[in-house]
Curated annotation (Swiss-Prot):
One of its GO terms (biological process) is translation. The keyword Translocase does not apply. This is Large ribosomal subunit protein uL24. Part of the 50S ribosomal subunit.
Length: 103
């Protein structure tokens, strides 16, 4: 099945404490979650690993968000948009449902 949200897509968060924030999708996980750049920052406590020369301490990183809580961002309308699929020249392409423009 083709994915509506893919890596490097610009998305906007629809729900949660980061509602309204925009960012680029850095990773799409197989369990229906995405990691968005600069959104849902968490603090992890990491142990030092002297063998690898890794220091311990508090590390800030992005956590996964469910794909249903983000929507693709349409730069023409400056709003969140829905994604549709259609065939053009024998290829399946994604398009914005608001203005039928190919992504």
């Amino acid at each position: 099945m083709a994915a509506k949200i893919r890596q490097n897509d610009e998305v906007i968060v629809l729900t949660g404490k980061d509602k309204g924030k925009r960012g680029k999708v850095t990773q799409v996980l197989p369990n229906g979650k995405v990691i968005v750049e600069g959104v849902k920052i968490i603090t992890k406590h990491e142990k030092p690993v002297p063998a690898l020369g890794k220091e311990g301490g508090l590390v800030k990183k992005e956590a996964a968000i469910d794909v249903s809580n983000v929507a693709i961002f349409n730069p023409k309308t400056n709003k969140a948009d829905r994604v549709g699929f259609r065939f053009e020249d024998g290829k399946k392409v994604r398009f914005f449902k608001s203005n039928n423009e190919i992504i």
